[in-house]
Amino acid sequence: MALLYLDPFNKVVKTAAGDFKFDDAIFMGHHQAADLVWKLGAVGKTADGKPSNWAAVHPQFYNMKDDPNVFVIGDSVGAVSPQFGHYPKSGHVANRMGRSVAQYIGQQAKGQPMTPVMIDNLCYMLVNTEPLEAISVKFDYKMGPEGHLLQTVTDDIFRRPQLWQEDLRWYGQMVKDFTGG
């Protein structure tokens, strides 16, 4: 949906589809792979030969098709499946990709073939503070019979405090992974 005009004072956004009032909103600009990916020449091409704006990588190993020793993870990764397109652009996905790439590099260093590691994605949404309530969505991936990644989505929309606590544990693990602590 193309943004025509944003009025943050009156909290109205105007689009080709109409005007929408909002209480709170997050607006995100155009996304694309990081500058380094462009400089490396790792951006893929669309069917008509134009830049895809995303790194062209193997859908399971995240390495470049032209150089299997160069890996790209996280938000810069392009489409990996005809079923769902891109992995979600999330910290959880980048974390899981990073873990699996570390394993792949270790396997390469030992002269072993890379063994695919199927990542997942998990997103908690803290929806209320009084009482504490959260919901979640989980994405699982597997290789389909035709050699394409398949995605299964599980929505957990039953609001409850246990999911809030699970989110805090998840966050703690992400911090440990990030800091090495």
Residue spans of the language-model regions?
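Internal hydrophobic alpha-helix adjacent to the cofactor/substrate pocket in enzyme cavities
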Residues: 92-119
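Short, electropositive alpha-helical surface patch
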Residues: 84-97, 123-138
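Hydrophobic alpha-helix feature that most strongly marks membrane-spanning transmembrane helices
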Residues: 30, 81, 103-106, 110, ...
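C-terminal auxiliary extensions adjacent to catalytic cores
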Residues: 134-181
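A structured beta-alpha segment of the ubiquitous adenosine-cofactor-binding alpha/beta core
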Residues: 3, 14-19
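FAD-site-proximal beta/loop scaffold in flavoenzymes
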Residues: 21-24, 28-94
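FAD-binding beta-loop-beta segment adjacent to the flavin cofactor pocket
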Residues: 53-72, 117, 127-147
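A conserved short coil-to-beta-strand element within the FAD-binding core of flavoproteins
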Residues: 1-11
